[in-house]
Design a protein with these regions (language model features):
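Bacterial Sec signal peptide processing site at the extreme N-terminus
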Residues: 11-34
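Positively charged n-region of N-terminal signal peptides that target proteins for export
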Residues: 1-6
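A structural "domain/chain start" motif
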Residues: 24, 28-29, 37-40, 45-60, ...
Length: 199
């Protein structure tokens, strides 16, 4: 009985340590969101458990590095000044906001060994998200207008996909719904089928 209990405890410790090691490796490899998700999952169960203390430190590190990486990418893409990058910039701002929203329910996280609360630098990205959403909608709308002028079935299909995306991120933008209807009608292949009964 003692051997079985000892074996169970040993396996449990091995699994716990490997999970921490996997989270550390994710951070080391630059997979910050994987590390954040793993740490959040563990801390959601019980954030005060002593065994979960390493996850708080890992979460702090991963959050800081992920935020710095995304903000660095945004700065670079803005300097590039290519309209094709607007969607990526918008997505990065959305990702920054989502990452913060995942952490908020867990706070405060207390680090026992350091006798302090975990520190997460939160920023309100709403203005940037709204500005980029407007800019992206305008860019895609002008792209759709160009595709419509080509008067080609495949371009109407591409236009429909762009219009659908605009409607998703910015509902009721200009006359997007009407253009979606037109793009769908002009992008559809109609096939005539006739049936004959033969014996």
């Amino acid at each position: 009985m003692k051997n079985a209990l000892l074996f169970a405890v040993l396996i449990f410790l091995t699994i716990s340590c490997s999970s921490i090691k996997n989270t550390q490796e994710a951070i080391g490899n630059g997979n910050y969101d994987v590390a954040i998700n793993t740490a959040v999952k563990k801390l959601k169960r019980n954030k005060t458990k002593k065994r979960n203390q390493p996850y708080i430190l890992l979460l702090e590190e991963a959050f800081e590095k992920a935020t710095a990486k995304d903000l660095g990418n945004i700065i670079f893409l803005k300097k590039d000044n290519n309209p094709e990058n607007i969607e990526t910039i918008y997505s990065l701002y959305e990702q920054l906001k989502r990452r913060q929203e995942v952490l908020k329910p867990l706070l405060p996280l207390y680090i026992v060994n350091l006798n302090r609360d975990a520190s997460f630098q939160f920023t309100n990205y709403d203005d940037e998200i709204i500005a980029n959403k407007k800019q992206l909608s305008d860019y895609l709308y002008s792209k759709v207008t160009t595709l419509f002028n080509r008067n080609n079935k495949f371009d109407y299909r591409r236009a429909y996909n762009d219009l659908e995306y605009i409607e998703k991120i910015n509902p009721s933008f200009k006359d997007v719904r009407n253009l979606m209807f037109v793009a769908r009608e002009r992008g559809v292949d109609f096939v005539i089928v006739s049936m004959k009964n033969q014996f």
